[in-house]
Amino acid sequence: MPVGAPRHWRLRALVRNPLVLGGLVLVVLFCGVAALAGVLAPADPIAMNTAGVLEAPSPAAPFGTDRFGRDVLSRAMFGARSSLFVGIGSIAIAATFGSVVGLLSGYFGGRLDNALGRVMEVFLTFPSLILAIAISAALGLGIQNALLAIAVTYWPVFGRLVRGATMGERSKDYVQAARVVGASGARVMRHHLLPNVLSPIVVQVTVAISQAIIIESSLSYLGLGTQPPTPSWGTMINEGRTFLDTAPWISVFPGLAIMGAVLAFNFLGDGLRDVLDPRSGGMNG
């Protein structure tokens, strides 16, 4: 394995990077709210109150109430659970499966690489949102199927990324030395190649999570993801679309939550890219 930058140097660089710090603080904040929603939420997110329908934001209900009198702040907090669960969970699956496929394809090459490359190209031909909608519609309604649809949509992104990085590493001296001493292909990939292609994977994970949150919200908005009365940012925006003139807070606050979460993961990814891959010059979109 090649000798890279000392770990303490990278840690210092991460700590000093304002994008990493800012993004990490926001990510921890959103995840903390999602995890502690049951404690932090001021009201039951699905409890209806016919006496308090469409109330404007006030000290009693900081984000107002919806058409059923449900507290929008509480629903936004619990909605973070659904959106972040699908966003993080789907990308975790996609990154794991895609990395394995990319390592196999890039290391062995030949017919295996050609076959796997063709499969990835087919998936990558379609826009992510359109493909996720099609897969989710085929699988059926529900948060689990939405998670699976996004995972299937994004694994080729990681597969192509890791394949390219692996092909760039496999001819280097440390890989050849491992082969000479009799290391198996599995050992070379696990102990030598994977650690050296991990940086771009980590960066891509943070960026992909932000995109997955948008797709999950879109699926829920269309009725394919999280099902009512379980709150989700996408379903909340959909429920408030007919009240944009009279009660805009129903849609505005979950929309702001989506924007904040997406920016948080993008900031974190941009900062990680600056530190782990300075040659990239930051995010390019």
What are these regions (language model features)?
Residues 1-99, 103-104, 110-114, 129, ...:
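Gly/Trp-centered helix-boundary motif
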Residues 13-14, 76-79, 83, 104, ...:
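Amphipathic alpha-helical segments that mediate coupling or scaffolding at interfaces
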Residues 23-26, 120, 149, 156, ...:
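Residue-level signature of the transmembrane alpha-helical cores
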Residues 30-34, 133-137, 150-156, 207, ...:
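Alpha-helical transmembrane segments of multi-pass membrane proteins
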Residues 62, 66, 96-168, 172, ...:
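Generic hydrophobic transmembrane alpha-helix motif, especially the helices
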Residues 70, 132, 172, 177-178, ...:
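A short, glycine- and basic residue-enriched loop/turn
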Residues 72-77, 84, 119, 126, ...:
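Short hydrophobic alpha-helical segments within the ABC transporter permease transmembrane module
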Residues 124, 135-138, 150, 165-166, ...:
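Glycine-rich helix-loop "coupling/hinge" segments at transmembrane-helix boundaries
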